[in-house]
C-alpha cells in the first residue's frame, strides 16, 4: 500500500464496540447507587447502572489519566520556568444535538469525577445561560434560530471561560430557565476555582471564521482540555425529540408560566405535527449546519442507538 492509500484509509479515531470499551474499566470502582443514577437521568433518556458501569466508568478512568498527565505537565513546566503559578482548572466540553442526552452525560461525569480520590471540586455549567435574552433575539429576528451560534452572547461566554482558566474567584454565569424559555433576570451560578469544569452545550465545539486581518480569534473549544460528542442518527434524534415534546406537553407545558403553555391542550396528532415542524425548521437545520460538522473535533465520540444506549465509542488518537 502506497503512502497516498494509507493516508486515504487513516482514521484519527480508535473505534471500540460496547464490550471492548467496557473492558477498559478494569478495577475502576462503582461509586454511585441505583437511586443516585436515577436522579441524573434527563426526561425520556435512559440511564441505568449497567450504562454507568460499561460506558461511564471507563470514561472516568480515561479522564483520570488525562487529568493526571496534565498535572504532571503543570509541575514540570513550573520547575522549568522557576515560577509558582496556580494550577488551571481542567475543562471538559460536552457537545451534541438537542435531545441526544448531553445533560445526562454531563451530570454523570460530574458525579463520578467528584468522587475521585482526593475529592476534586467539579462544577457544571450549560451554555444555555449565554443565550441572548428573548427580547434581544426577537428584536434581531432570531427567535426561530435559538440555539444557532448567532443566538449566543459569545463574547460573554469567552470572557467567562477566560476568567475560569486564569483562576479568577467567583466567576458568574447567567442562569437559563427551560420553563420560561429565557434567561432568568439577575440570577447567576457562581463558579469558584473548580478543579474540573464541565461545559455542556450544542455548539461548544463550533469553530469561527478565519479573520481577514490574520488576527487570532478565540473559540469556546480553545479552552477545553478534553471534549465529548454525543452522537445518534438523525431519524433517531427526531424520534427522541418528538417523544420528549409529547412528554413535556403532558407535564411542564401545563404550568401557566411555561413558554410552551399554549401547546398543553394539543392532541397527540397535533403535538406530533408541531414537534416535527419545530424539529425540521430549527433543530435539524442547526444539527446539519452547525453541530454535526463539529463532531470530528471531539476527543471522544459516544454513538447511541435507538434505545438510548451507547453501542460504540470512538477515541481520538494522540
Swiss-Prot record:
GO MF annotation, one: ATP binding
Matches recorded under InterPro entries: P-loop_NTPase (IPR027417), PanK (IPR004566), PRK/URK (IPR006083)
E.C. numbers: 2.7.1.33
Entry-linked Pfam families: PRK (PF00485)
Originating organism: Rhodopseudomonas palustris (strain HaA2)
Protein family membership: Belongs to the prokaryotic pantothenate kinase family.
SUPFAM superfamilies: P-loop containing nucleoside triphosphate hydrolases (SSF52540)
Superkingdom to which the source organism belongs: Bacteria
CC terms in the record's Gene Ontology section: cytoplasm
Protein name per its UniProtKB record: Pantothenate kinase
UniProt-listed CDD domains: PanK
Subcellular location: Cytoplasm
Catalytic activity: (R)-pantothenate + ATP = (R)-4'-phosphopantothenate + ADP + H(+)
Entry annotated with the keyword Transferase: yes
GO biological process per UniProt: coenzyme A biosynthetic process
UniProt keyword list: ATP-binding, Coenzyme A biosynthesis, Cytoplasm, Kinase, Nucleotide-binding, Transferase
Positions of ATP binding: 96-103
Listed pathway(s): Cofactor biosynthesis; coenzyme A biosynthesis; CoA from (R)-pantothenate: step 1/5
Amino acid at each position: 500500500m502506497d503512502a497516498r492509500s494509507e493516508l486515504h484509509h487513516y482514521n484519527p479515531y480508535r473505534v471500540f464496540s460496547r464490550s471492548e470499551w467496557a473492558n477498559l474499566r478494569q478495577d475502576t470502582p462503582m461509586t454511585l447507587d441505583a437511586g443516585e443514577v436515577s436522579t441524573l437521568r434527563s426526561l425520556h433518556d435512559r440511564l441505568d447502572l449497567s450504562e454507568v458501569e460499561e460506558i461511564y466508568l471507563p470514561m472516568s478512568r480515561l479522564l483520570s489519566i488525562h487529568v493526571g498527565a496534565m498535572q504532571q505537565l503543570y509541575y514540570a513546566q513550573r520547575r522549568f520556568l522557576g515560577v509558582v503559578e496556580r494550577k488551571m482548572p481542567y475543562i471538559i466540553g460536552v457537545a451534541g444535538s438537542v435531545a441526544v442526552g448531553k445533560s445526562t452525560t454531563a451530570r454523570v461525569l460530574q458525579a463520578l469525577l467528584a468522587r475521585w480520590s482526593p475529592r476534586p471540586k467539579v462544577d457544571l455549567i450549560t451554555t444555555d445561560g449565554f443565550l441572548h435574552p428573548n427580547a434581544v433575539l426577537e428584536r434581531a429576528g432570531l427567535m426561530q434560530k435559538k440555539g444557532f451560534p448567532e443566538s449566543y452572547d459569545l463574547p460573554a461566554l469567552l470572557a467567562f471561560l477566560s476568567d475560569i482558566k486564569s483562576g479568577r474567584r467567583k466567576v458568574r454565569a447567567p442562569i437559563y430557565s427551560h420553563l420560561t424559555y429565557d434567561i432568568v433576570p439577575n440570577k447567576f451560578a457562581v463558579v469558584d476555582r473548580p478543579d474540573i469544569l464541565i461545559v455542556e452545550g450544542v455548539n461548544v465545539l463550533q469553530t469561527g471564521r478565519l479573520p481577514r486581518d490574520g488576527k487570532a480569534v478565540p473559540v469556546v473549544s480553545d479552552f477545553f482540555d478534553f471534549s465529548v460528542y454525543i452522537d445518534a442518527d438523525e431519524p433517531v434524534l427526531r424520534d427522541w425529540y418528538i417523544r420528549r415534546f409529547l412528554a413535556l406537553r403532558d407535564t411542564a407545558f401545563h404550568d401557566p408560566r411555561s413558554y410552551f403553555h399554549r401547546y398543553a391542550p394539543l392532541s397527540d396528532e397535533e403535538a406530533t405535527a408541531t414537534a416535527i415542524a419545530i424539529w425540521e425548521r430549527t433543530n435539524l437545520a442547526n444539527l446539519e449546519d452547525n453541530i454535526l460538522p463539529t463532531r470530528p473535533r471531539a476527543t471522544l465520540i459516544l454513538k447511541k442507538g435507538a434505545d438510548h444506549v451507547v453501542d460504540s465509542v470512538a477515541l481520538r488518537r494522540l
